[in-house]
């Protein structure tokens, strides 16, 4: 960001975009009470990047389907079992890395993440739900293709999400 700014670029943090208008020589970006004018845009909107791209007049072939990863922390007396990162052998048929063990800088050890569909783009808890986000997910054909291909894995991931015993057993 510093290099970008040093060359004349502007960075607007914490500025939710409500509307983007394409002009002949650039864009008008509306955010709250402010309007920004730009010749070019750099989209760093994370989980909202596909929505911003569509607002800018692009038609991306992809959509972001939000997944949430959950971690469990080892009991302190079990932390000595893991001295370094441990990754599973990847399954080339799966789009996810798999649950791994990570020794943190404070000596604790975490196991995770799993991968479960988030019911909201920024849904980090099971209780985070957005009906508009769900409607967008379910309206996207790519979601149904993914679901048809990995439905068994999806069910297993949810079982492990709702049962710590099943999560631990799968390690």
For each predicted feature, which ranges?
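Rossmann-like NAD(P)H-binding beta-loop-alpha module
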Residues: 1, 6-7, 25-26
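A conserved beta-strand/loop element that lines the FAD pocket in flavoprotein oxidoreductases
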Residues: 5-17
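Hydrophobic, well-ordered secondary-structure segments
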Residues: 1, 14, 46-50
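Short amphipathic alpha-helical segments at helix-loop
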Residues: 15, 30-33, 151-152
């Amino acid at each position: 960001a510093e290099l970008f700014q040093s060359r004349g670029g502007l960075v607007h943090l914490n500025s939710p975009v409500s509307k983007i208008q394409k002009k002949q020589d650039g864009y008008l970006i509306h955010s709250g009470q402010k309007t920004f004018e730009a010749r070019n845009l750099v989209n760093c909107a994370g989980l909202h990047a596909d929505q911003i791209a569509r607002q800018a007049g692009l038609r991306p072939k992809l959509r972001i389907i939000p997944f949430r990863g959950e971690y469990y922390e080892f009991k302190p007396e079990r932390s000595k079992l893991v001295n370094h990162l441990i990754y599973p052998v990847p399954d080339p048929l799966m789009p996810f890395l798999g649950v791994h063990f990570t020794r943190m800088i404070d000596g604790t050890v975490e196991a995770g993440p799993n991968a479960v569909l988030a019911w909201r783009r920024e849904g980090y808890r099971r209780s985070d739900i957005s009906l508009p986000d769900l409607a967008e997910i379910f309206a996207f054909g790519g979601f149904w293709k993914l679901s048809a291909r990995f439905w068994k894995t999806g069910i297993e991931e949810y079982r492990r999400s709702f049962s710590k015993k099943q999560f631990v057993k799968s390690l």
